[in-house]
A protein has these predicted regions:
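N-terminal glycine-rich anion-binding loops that anchor highly charged ligand groups
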Residues: 1-7, 26-44
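N-terminal amphipathic alpha-helix/helix-capping segment at the start of soluble metabolic enzymes
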Residues: 1-19
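N-terminal active-site wall of soluble small-molecule enzyme domains
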Residues: 4-5, 27, 50-93
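Generic structural signal for hydrophobic
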Residues: 10, 35, 90, 117-118
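Hydrophobic faces of well-ordered beta-strands that scaffold small-molecule active sites
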Residues: 16-21, 42-46, 74-79, 98-100
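Glycine-enriched alpha-helix->loop->beta-strand junction motifs that scaffold or abut catalytic
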Residues: 38-40, 92-97
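Active-site loop-to-helix "anion-binding N-cap" substructures in soluble metabolic enzymes
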Residues: 87, 92-95, 105-110
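Conserved anion-binding
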Residues: 99-118
Length: 118
């Protein structure tokens, strides 16, 4: 099921989906081990800096392998991305969602480029 469907279901049924950022394999394993005990789904986040440091391909591979190992639905979120080109690249690589931090970009710039990205 797509993340947006889970988000709608959670809102309708009044329950939450946890989102946890990770920057190491150990953190990812810890998050997924805890979530698997509750048989819940999870949103896994990386900041723009973390995703650049770890690499989008590597993050996606780690998450896909971990989803199979722990048998839970997990979705990737780019947390507080600033660079519109990097956000687009993350989505193209398989990130399910993104939070856009627009403090460093004028709103007119964001609006003029956003429609061409997604």
């Amino acid at each position: 099921m797509e993340l947006k469907n889970y988000l709608k279901k959670a809102q309708r049924e009044k329950w939450a989906i946890g989102q946890f950022n990770f920057s190491t394999l150990e953190q990812l394993r810890g998050i997924l081990a805890a979530v698997s005990k509750t048989k819940s789904l999870v949103i896994l986040g990386t900041s723009e800096g973390e995703s650049r440091f770890l690499g989008l391909e590597e993050i996606l591979a780690l998450v896909e392998i971990s989803k199979m190992k722990y048998k839970i639905p997990a979705y990737l979120n780019l947390d507080h991305g600033k660079d519109l080109k990097w956000i687009k690249k993350a989505v193209d690589f398989g990130y399910s969602s993104r939070n856009l931090l627009i403090l460093d970009n004028p709103l007119t710039y964001i609006l003029s480029h956003f429609h061409t990205m997604f």
